[in-house]
Regions:
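Short beta-rich binding modules
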Residues: 1-135
């Protein structure tokens, strides 16, 4: 593996600005069927991107940033609550619904992504996906 190079010393790096809470059009760029390390529950992990064209006019994401990337985990146990959440996720992206879902069907599809401000593990504010909705 090669060395990672940066234009400035990473010791001087500051936390990036957080995308403000709101609704943005975004696209699913990757989808994976996984098992949660902490609980052992099956889940669908979606990688969602919001392009800079959707950012508020007064939001400066920093030099060279053309999109914000988020991860959405949808627990997929075969219980009523998880089936309901999966239904709403499929509906948001226009993915066909049946008793089996192909994660690949999400890739390339768009939805409204509702961003909220949560906290990271160190209690710092962090933009995160609160909900996905149909366009």
């Amino acid at each position: 593996m090669g060395l990672l190079s940066f234009s400035s010393n990473i010791a001087d790096a500051e936390a990036p600005p957080q995308l403000p809470a709101g609704e943005y059009k975004g696209v699913c760029t990757a989808a994976q069927d996984k098992v949660a390390a902490s609980s052992g529950n099956p889940m669908l992990t979606l990688t969602l991107q919001i392009p800079s064209s959707e950012f508020p006019a007064d939001f400066d994401p920093g030099e060279g940033v053309d999109a914000q990337t988020f991860t959405l985990n949808v627990v997929s146990r075969d219980i009523p609550a998880d089936r309901w959440r999966m239904k709403n996720t499929c509906k948001a992206f226009g993915v066909p619904m049946s008793n089996s879902i192909d994660p690949n069907d999400f890739v390339g599809r768009e939805a409204r992504i509702r961003i909220r401000i949560g906290q990271d593990l160190e209690k710092n504010p962090r933009a995160e996906v609160g909900q996905v909705l149909p366009l």
